[in-house]
């Protein structure tokens, strides 16, 4: 039986030193394996006490000093919920740490036995004990650094024992990351900002989630996305959790570690102290005893499949369990030569690998394998046996044999044997690639998708991007890539190809939109995110010609795109070529327009590029089929790239706009977005999503071939938000109004008028139906915009166009009679004192709304019409006086605004020498004088009612000369 005798250096606690002079331990079975080494169950020969002995491998004195410093701290810890430290045994390059044996294994094992996880009441006992242990540790200045269910052990009576703090973290911190501890790590640790005792509180919260759901937060994300989620996202617990528990978790998951509660504070939390079905006083009845119960160590704690870096030294093999069994059966162990001879034989394969590694040197094992693989023909049974040896080496021997095999030049011999090569793919891909596994005949022999994708992904890091893309074009099976899209490596490869390989648009995209793949795409938000992001890249990088011709343009300002055949810019007369037109006309956007999405290689398409891109057949149908599915996805990253893809699609092919206009699922999707975004903290991404949606809706309103109540209703919802989407909503309303005026015919004549209450405009779409446009909502939007808002110029331009339309005199009157009208106008001029164009736009707007209001309320010679002297018209006369009083007030302000002699005037005021500004001010001033509105040929022309048939004909024939700005057809005294 193996033992650790007193010939080795044994360091004991004071109690042990007082009771015995030497200690000998019998090593029983292996109960754990991990990044740190091996854990054995052992028995003290003198006392029969069962202990756990952890083997820690170190490589140099520096690592040994780190371990010894931690041990010096551990030996002073003494708490019921901390695994007791008994001492250590030091050998050449191993350190054996003697710890308390926990018969019931880890809490992870207990959780795994449940189909759904522990209940809240069950978990409270374990959480409370864990907090007691953390309170003690933190009071001693110790940070655990790796709290999770696998590191919370249970004694024979189910008392919680915190284990694996300090030692394994110091010895191999990178191994912890590889083991998957990212899901439990606090943001300050992931961000390399340093750990504190409060970092353990975050990990405790993740462990509570693990107890109740069997998985930690963000368990379905890749490593890169876990980093992002922990740092930036808010974790929302399942709805089944009680409110006290949700509050408990919210306190654990505070991103600022200095605002997190301590373990002592959490012990006082209402969730911990609620006593329903829980008797907390039972904790005090737990007693420790060391029974020789059957071990219950679970696979999670053993971490049998860790990807760790092995030691550079060829260390002594682990103590052999076979010796104990052989002594009992009175057998002698085989010799090294016997084992190596058996290893070469294909007729009698070696099955006891533990014996092989205990007796034979690593060099001799590696040399024997190389000798066999060098034969002309190699038996398949030998290949299988060698594969098992490498697997055992990885799991139980720190990969020392694999390192020796590489050093002795064995890799070229396994290239043609996938069963052997796969054992090196994950840990040593570069070595395989350097030995020629990516050479086409060798690569073609590989059949396992996981290893193929891993090698292709690693090949990217070792070659140039251009070469890698060309290689993938020739040798990568696209169907294999897409059928394994659930694999992390497949997702990474797809993103890289879509970003850098121009051929991905023609070779990958048609296969990606196959309806058979849709279910796989929707398996998880991560996959959906990758697919939509990749297609965005493919569209914007599919051809070198597009790269050269693409000019960055704003995806949020459709008015800056080339006018379509139905654009109001080409359909409504304007009295003059105005600065409004200059601001609204087509112009190239700044190259920094897409700074917020600078991680995109290219994400804009110029008008020239639109002609070069032809989307695959069925692409639009495939894309729109996701509108219903998006209702189940709350991930903003997915929605961001989905909406961007929708915008790019209709921007490339405007014929899809009318198809989208008839798609009820599209408008339902917008309503669903409206319910999700208010509860998301990522304002930047939310703004980007709305930017794409409103851009699509604006383009739809420009190209629509029929009036859409759904689009109109959506636009009104945008307006009611009173934010950046409101301007787009107003623009859509304007385009809808222009559409009704453009498409008047003799059978159905859509008109714009007002109801008797003057509270709404009725936009008639046919003889039986009309859409209501509330005046008060338009007025509220005008006054809701801040004076310094960057959208002011656009707002004034759109309001000018709407107010100039026939039938909207009531809107102009309501704007003027608003209590804040004068203050708003003064504030506008004060804010934009240095902008000549905006001041001109404001003056034109003022002139328009006063002239239309006066024409509505007054007769057209400046005198009340005696024929209309009814009681309502007498009230109109009082309204006229009120309106003129406001006009006089505005005129006085304008007189002083550019007057250099006024003391309070801004010294940097521009426009005082502008002929156009002077003329506009004079026009506005003249409106306050009687007789200023000359008699015109028709009342309908002056007021701005719907045009006659002849007028409509003239309107359409002159649309190519129009800039979209119209006022009532009248003249003013100047």
Swiss-Prot record:
InterPro entries: Kinase-like_dom_sf, Prot_kinase_dom, Protein_kinase_ATP_BS, Ser/Thr_kinase_AS, STE20/SPS1-PAK. It catalyses: L-seryl-[protein] + ATP = O-phospho-L-seryl-[protein] + ADP + H(+); L-threonyl-[protein] + ATP = O-phospho-L-threonyl-[protein] + ADP + H(+). The modification Phosphothreonine is found at residue 870. The active site is at 146 (proton acceptor). Residues 554-563 have a biased composition (Low complexity). Residues 554-592, 941-974 are annotated as: Disordered. Residues 948-963 have a biased composition (Basic and acidic residues). Residues 25-272 form the Protein kinase domain. It is found in: Cytoplasm, Cytoskeleton, Spindle pole; Bud neck. GO terms for biological process: meiotic spindle disassembly; mitotic cytokinesis; negative regulation of protein localization to nucleolus; positive regulation of ascospore-type prospore membrane formation; regulation of exit from mitosis. Phosphorylation by CDK1 reduces the binding to the mother spindle pole body. The extent of phosphorylation gradually increases during cell-cycle progression until some point during late anaphase/telophase when it is rapidly dephosphorylated by CDC14. Phosphorylation inhibits kinase activity and dephosphorylation by CDC14 activates CDC15. One of its GO terms (molecular function) is protein serine/threonine kinase activity. Gene3D superfamilies: Transferase(Phosphotransferase) domain 1. Its main location: cytoplasm. One of its GO terms (cellular component) is spindle pole. Keywords: ATP-binding, Cell cycle, Cell division, Cytoplasm, Cytoskeleton, Kinase, Mitosis, Nucleotide-binding, Phosphoprotein, Serine/threonine-protein kinase, Transferase. Induction: Constitutively expressed. Belongs to the protein kinase superfamily. Ser/Thr protein kinase family. Protein kinase of the mitotic exit network (MEN) essential for late nuclear division in the mitotic cycle. Promotes mitotic exit by phosphorylating DBF2 and directly switching on DBF2 kinase activity. Involved in the localization of DBF2 and DBF20 to the neck which is necessary to undergo cytokinesis. Plays a role in segregation of chromosomes during recovery from spindle checkpoint activation. Required for spindle pole localization of CDK1 and inactivation of CDC2 kinase activity at the end of mitosis. Required for spindle disassembly after meiosis II and plays a role in spore morphogenesis. Present with 238 molecules/cell in log phase SD medium. The region between residues 360 and 702 is essential for function and is required for self-association and for binding to spindle pole bodies. The region between residues 751 and 974 is an auto-inhibitory domain which inhibits MEN signaling. This is Cell division control protein 15. The lineage of its organism: Eukaryota, Fungi, Dikarya, Ascomycota, Saccharomycotina. The gene is CDC15.
